[in-house]
Amino acid sequence: MNDRQAALDQALKQIEKQFGKGSIMKLGEHSDQNISTISSGSLALDIALGVGGYPRGRIIEVYGPESSGKTTVALHAIAEVQAQGGTAAFIDAEHALDPAYAKNLGVNIDELLLSQPDTGEQALEIAEALVRSGAVDMLVIDSVAALVPRAEIEGEMGDAHVGLQARLMSQALRKLSGVINKSKTIAIFINQIREKVGVMFGNPEITPGGRALKFYSTVRLEVRRAEQLKQGTDVMGNKTKIKVVKNKVAPPFRIAEVDIMYGEGISREGELVDMAAEVDVINKSGSWYSYKEERIGQGRENAKQYLKEHTDIRDEISKRVREEYEIDGSNKEPLDEGEETLSLLDDE
């Protein structure tokens, strides 16, 4: 047994000498066993994710039909990163980002790094350069479907380019996954939905860009509109369901229901009323909502309005709900990792 241990120790020393300190270690000696996270900007989604937010150093895919709220979900995460003093980048391959809407969601557009690349290769090379800097906390690519290979852009209309985009994504993710993990960057890929022709049984819906993103993603979120939210005859927004269809860090298949209001994004008060009532932090009796035996509104909309006007009570309820769901922020790390991440520039 001693000979085996000595041989193992010798092998570990050789590996560390060749590849650097920390290239191999016992898991128990690793200082970062708990997964550090950054809030998604939505209480309901933080709870559905199971760890209180998006895991750092991982790839996230957000997909769904058109106008379902995918970009809104990503922009809320960017606002949360910036609020904690972090740096975020948005690669707008669709050339469709609305700065005014992003600002309404809390994004500091003056500090947001924005790129509107011409080709898929350019977009992914920019993404790699940003991640390798070690100074970007969140990177959003909107969207995978718009990452058009250079050969397709330079070719003629109607030319067949079979599998080009899938190969591009597969190669890019092989290069990106390791450095994303080292740099603790959260990479959010927004994706669209297509339908396979001739599918008789099962779900005909697929996401563009091949299968690589499905494999490399730690978390996959499906965003869908459930119903319209109306005030009289006017449509004010949508009730949206966000389903965690894949999760490597917590149990999957949880669903977060949020109100996405036009021009405002996710209603924090709406999800707070729902989640607080679920764990009896807020009591619901008939149509009345009450907190600490004080009525805060008749009907959900009035309770939402009360919390919007009384931010101190809203924050107090939010803190209690997070404690009930055991996502009180104990796994949050400072976003500024200091000099350590800069060594990524010298990798390879």
UniProtKB/Swiss-Prot annotation:
One cellular component (GO) term of this entry: cytosol
Residues the record lists as binding ATP: 64-71
Principal location: cytoplasm
Record GO biological process: DNA recombination; DNA repair; SOS response
InterPro entries in alphabetical order: AAA+_ATPase (IPR003593), DNA_recomb/repair_RecA (IPR013765), DNA_recomb/repair_RecA_CS (IPR020584), P-loop_NTPase (IPR027417), RecA-like_C (IPR049261), RecA-like_N (IPR049428), RecA_ATP-bd (IPR020588), RecA_C_sf (IPR023400)
Keywords: ATP-binding, Cytoplasm, DNA damage, DNA recombination, DNA repair, DNA-binding, Nucleotide-binding, SOS response
GO molecular function: ATP binding; ATP hydrolysis activity; ATP-dependent DNA damage sensor activity; damaged DNA binding; single-stranded DNA binding
Domain of life, source organism: Bacteria
Gene3D superfamilies noted in UniProt: P-loop containing nucleotide triphosphate hydrolases (3.40.50.300)
Biased composition (Acidic residues): 336-348
SUPFAM superfamilies from the UniProt entry: P-loop containing nucleoside triphosphate hydrolases, RecA protein, C-terminal domain
One Pfam match: RecA_C
Keyword DNA repair belongs to the record: yes
Region span, Disordered: 325-348
Function in brief: Can catalyze the hydrolysis of ATP in the presence of single-stranded DNA, the ATP-dependent uptake of single-stranded DNA by duplex DNA, and the ATP-dependent hybridization of homologous single-stranded DNAs. It interacts with LexA causing its activation and leading to its autocatalytic cleavage.
Family the entry assigns: Belongs to the RecA family.
Protein name: Protein RecA
